C-alpha cells in the first residue's frame, strides 16, 4: 500500500470513520437542496490555496462552533439549515474526540468530513465580502456635557411573537416585533428618530453614555463594542435585540443623495463626514429606522467579542452570514484578493472560515462579513473591505447536494394517455402516412425520342 494511502487510513481510524470512496459515501447520504442558490461540487485540488492554509488553527476555530452546536444555543432557521446543523453535530463529535490535531491531521479531518461545494446566488458569478470589527469607544457611566448619547439595554416592553427568536435573522423574518398596547394589540416599536428624540427617557435603560449618536450608530452596526470609561476600565457590550424595523445602510443613503461617490464609501469616510456635518448626519442616520439594544458581557481584555452563534469570534476566521441560508458552525473556504495591507486589493485571502455571526446587511448565500478583531487597525482594514470573492461551502458528507437531481426519473417514451389508446405520435404518422410516388407507365419500345428528330 502506498505511504499516502496508509497515512489516510491512519487518520481516518483516528477520527473514528472509515476512509471509503466518495461514491460509496454519497449513496448513503441524505439529499439536501439550497433554495434560491446555485451550487456545484468541486474537488479539493480546485481550491486555490487550500493546501497552504493553517488547518490546525482552522480546526481550533471549528471546535469553538462545535461547543455551541452541542449546547443547542441557536435553533435552525429552515429545513436545509436544520439538516446541516444535525450533520455538523456528528462531525463535531468526531472532532472533539480527536482534538487536538496537528496540521496534516487537521487537513485530513476536513477533507474526510466534508465535501466542497461552490455556491452563489442564482445567476451570480462571485460572492461579496465586507469586514467588521469591535470598536473601542470612549464613554461614561453617567451623563455629562461631553458624553450625552445613551447606549440602551433591551426595553422590557419590546415583545416578539412568531416562529423565530428576535436575535436570529435581520430584519425580523417571520416574526412580529413591537410593543404591546392594551391586552392584545401589538404596534411597531419606536424607530431611531423617536428613540433619539427621547422615547425611552426616564426608564433607566441606559448602560452608559457615549460622546455622540455617531458613536452609538457605529457600535450598533458592528454589533459589539469596548467602552473605555473615564476611570480606565473597559465595559464590554454585545448585541441583545433590535426594534424590528428594517436596516438601511447609511452609506447607500449618502450615495443616493450624491453626497459621496460609491467608490469612496468606507466606514472611516462615513464617520469623518458625519462628524464634520452633524445636522446633515442626523437626517441621514435616521433613514436607518433600525435600532439595536445591547447587553453587558463579562469578558477579559484578551477575549474577542461574542458572535450570534454564542462563541468568541476569531479574527480572520469568523464570518457573519445570512442565517436563512446557512447554519452556525458551517465552514467555508473563501478565495479573494482584499485590500488588507493598504487600499489596493492585492492581499491574497485563501482561508477556511466559519459561520459564527450574523448581521442585518448580510443577505444571500454567497455574502459574508469577515471579523478582523478590535481596535483602530482592525477598523481600518474592515472599513476597506468591499470586494468580490469565491465561496465554497464545506458540506458534511452525510448530506448529498446532487441526490435530488440524480434521482429525477426519465420521462416515458410516449405519453401514457396516448399509449392507452394505441395512438401513433405525430412523428410516426408522418413517417408511415406519406404516400409513395406512383410508378410511371413504361414507354412503348418503338417510340423514338423527340431530341434530334427532324420534322
Predicted regions and their residues:
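Bacterial N-terminal signal peptides
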Residues: 3-21
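N-terminal processing/targeting junctions
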Residues: 14-15, 23, 68, 139, ...
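Cleaved targeting-peptide boundary
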Residues: 20, 24-35
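C-terminal soluble interaction/assembly domains
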Residues: 27-30, 40, 51, 301-455
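Secretory/export targeting leaders with adjacent low-complexity proregions
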Residues: 36-300, 304-309, 453
Amino acid at each position: 500500500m502506498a505511504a499516502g494511502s496508509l497515512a489516510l487510513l491512519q487518520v481516518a481510524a483516528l477520527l473514528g470513520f472509515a476512509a471509503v470512496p466518495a461514491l460509496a459515501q454519497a449513496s448513503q447520504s441524505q439529499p439536501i437542496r439550497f433554495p434560491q442558490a446555485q451550487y456545484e461540487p468541486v474537488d479539493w485540488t480546485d481550491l486555490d490555496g487550500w493546501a497552504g492554509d493553517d488547518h490546525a488553527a482552522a480546526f481550533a476555530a471549528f471546535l469553538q462552533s462545535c461547543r455551541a452546536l452541542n449546547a443547542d444555543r441557536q435553533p435552525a432557521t429552515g429545513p436545509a439549515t436544520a439538516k446541516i446543523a444535525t450533520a455538523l453535530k456528528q462531525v463535531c463529535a468526531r472532532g472533539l474526540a480527536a482534538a487536538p490535531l496537528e496540521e496534516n491531521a487537521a487537513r485530513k479531518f476536513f477533507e474526510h468530513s466534508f465535501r466542497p461545494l461552490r455556491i452563489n446566488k442564482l445567476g451570480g458569478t462571485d460572492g461579496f465580502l465586507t469586514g467588521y470589527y469591535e470598536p473601542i469607544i470612549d464613554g461614561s457611566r453617567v451623563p455629562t456635557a461631553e458624553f450625552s448619547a445613551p447606549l440602551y439595554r433591551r426595553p422590557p416592553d419590546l415583545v416578539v411573537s412568531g416562529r423565530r427568536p428576535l436575535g436570529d435573522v435581520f430584519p425580523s423574518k417571520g416574526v412580529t416585533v413591537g410593543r404591546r398596547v392594551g391586552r392584545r394589540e401589538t404596534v411597531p416599536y419606536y424607530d431611531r428618530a423617536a428613540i433619539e428624540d427621547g422615547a425611552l427617557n426616564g426608564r433607566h435603560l441606559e448602560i452608559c453614555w457615549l460622546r455622540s449618536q455617531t458613536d452609538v450608530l457605529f457600535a450598533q452596526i458592528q454589533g459589539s463594542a469596548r467602552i473605555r470609561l473615564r476611570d480606565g476600565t473597559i465595559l464590554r457590550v454585545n448585541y441583545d435585540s433590535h426594534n424590528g424595523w428594517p436596516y438601511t445602510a447609511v452609506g447607500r443613503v449618502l450615495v443616493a443623495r450624491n453626497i459621496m461617490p460609491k467608490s469612496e464609501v468606507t466606514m472611516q469616510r462615513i464617520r469623518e463626514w458625519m462628524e464634520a456635518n452633524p445636522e446633515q448626519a442626523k437626517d441621514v442616520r435616521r433613514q436607518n429606522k433600525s435600532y439595536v439594544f445591547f447587553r453587558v458581557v463579562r469578558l477579559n481584555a484578551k477575549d474577542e467579542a461574542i458572535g450570534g452563534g454564542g462563541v468568541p469570534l476569531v479574527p480572520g476566521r469568523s464570518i457573519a452570514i445570512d442565517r436563512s441560508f446557512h447554519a452556525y458552525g458551517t465552514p467555508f473556504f473563501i478565495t479573494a484578493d482584499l485590500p488588507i495591507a493598504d487600499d489596493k486589493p492585492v492581499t491574497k485571502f485563501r482561508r477556511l472560515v466559519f459561520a459564527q455571526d450574523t448581521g442585518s446587511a448580510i443577505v444571500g448565500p454567497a455574502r459574508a462579513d469577515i471579523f478582523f478583531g478590535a481596535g483602530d487597525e482592525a477598523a481600518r482594514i474592515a472599513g476597506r473591505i468591499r470586494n468580490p470573492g469565491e465561496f465554497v461551502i464545506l458540506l458534511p458528507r452525510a448530506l448529498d447536494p446532487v441526490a435530488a437531481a440524480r434521482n429525477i426519473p426519465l420521462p416515458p417514451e410516449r405519453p401514457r394517455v396516448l399509449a392507452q389508446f394505441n395512438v401513433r405520435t405525430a412523428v410516426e404518422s408522418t413517417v408511415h402516412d406519406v404516400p409513395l410516388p406512383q410508378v410511371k407507365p413504361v414507354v412503348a419500345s418503338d417510340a423514338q425520342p423527340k431530341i434530334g428528330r427532324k420534322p
